[in-house]
């Protein structure tokens, strides 16, 4: 507990909250260009080939973003929309690519949870 004299000398500092997605600069999404599309293996105990892309954002950051859903058309020079949200079993992947916008098409033949994968309602 500080004394009154100590509080006069230097006031209490507010607790600064640290963002989990600094590359978005406080925006809900950011546009970017894919520089590399590849697969990586998840941490133990999971095993798969997770599709990720290295993306150069309009904010100037170069990030690794996860490509959700089964199958994708993303390749180098694709323009994509990136949102926050980490992938728990991929260290260093703190962003998701938004499917169904810009160059990232929606997931083919998706019936449930369509809004998360950019799929229109089937006729």
Curated annotation (Swiss-Prot):
Name of the protein this chain belongs to: Small ribosomal subunit protein uS12c
UniProt superkingdom: Eukaryota
Any one Gene Ontology molecular-function term assigned to this protein's record: structural constituent of ribosome
PANTHER family reported for this sequence: 30S RIBOSOMAL PROTEIN S12 FAMILY MEMBER (PTHR11652)
Role of this protein: With S4 and S5 plays an important role in translational accuracy. Located at the interface of the 30S and 50S subunits.
PROSITE patterns for the chain: RIBOSOMAL_S12
Xref: HAMAP family: Ribosomal_uS12_B
InterPro entries: NA-bd_OB-fold, Ribosomal_uS12, Ribosomal_uS12_bac
Name of the coding gene: rps12
Acyltransferase listed as a keyword: no
Species of provenance: Oenothera elata subsp. hookeri (Hooker's evening primrose)
Subunit structure: Part of the 30S ribosomal subunit.
Pfam family, one: Ribosom_S12_S23
